[in-house]
């Protein structure tokens, strides 16, 4: 099943913004839910398991989500992970670098095939959209309702308001750390 996320890099992520992204992605990793309801919830009964790069060895510590320069793949630092190959939950590796290299853009998309690690791919894309606005142009085959479970979980984890990328949401809806406020998002106004 094809289910793509696109993230064309437009600029290098400034050091301070990359550090904030890393910190929040590690926090999200340490608070992962047991299963994924993103991407239409096709794997809602399967655990979210992240593995290094190609999906062979499990990530146990959040620091292991990040690697430095991998030759022809990217320069600088990147988050690089996949689903678990041992149980058939891997698809295309997700690589998100901090350094813009116009000559090497082959990883500007990730086909998660709706597998459980899609949850964390969406998490990373929401966080980089928030922490480094303008550095990536983000879109997806998924619709707003496919990303909503992730952002509703993520806003309380990081403790501040978040928005989805414009190409996914279209309306700029805000999601808040308070779960009560999140329930109010999208409700009709009764003011006449």
Language-model segment annotations:
Residues 1-191:
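Acidic (Asp/Glu-rich) sequence patches and key acidic residues
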């Amino acid at each position: 099943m094809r289910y793509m996320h696109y993230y064309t890099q437009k600029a290098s992520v400034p050091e301070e913004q990359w550090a904030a992204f890393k910190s929040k992605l590690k926090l999200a990793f340490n608070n992962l839910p047991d299963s994924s309801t993103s991407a239409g919830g096709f794997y809602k009964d399967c655990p979210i398991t992240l593995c290094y790069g190609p999906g062979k060895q499990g990530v146990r510590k959040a620091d292991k989500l990040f690697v430095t320069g991998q030759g022809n793949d990217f320069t600088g630092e990147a988050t690089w992970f996949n689903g678990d190959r041992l149980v058939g939950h891997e698809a295309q590796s997700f690589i998100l670098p901090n350094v813009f290299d116009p000559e090497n853009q082959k990883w500007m998309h990730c086909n998660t095939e709706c597998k459980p690690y899609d949850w964390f791919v969406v998490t990373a894309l929401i966080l980089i959209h928030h922490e480094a606005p303008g550095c990536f142009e983000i879109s997806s085959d998924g619709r707003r309702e496919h990303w909503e479970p992730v952002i509703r979980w993520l806003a309380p984890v990081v403790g501040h308001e978040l928005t989805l990328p414009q190409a996914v949401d279209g309306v700029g809806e805000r999601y808040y750390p308070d779960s009560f406020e999140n329930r109010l998002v999208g409700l009709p106004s009764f003011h006449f």
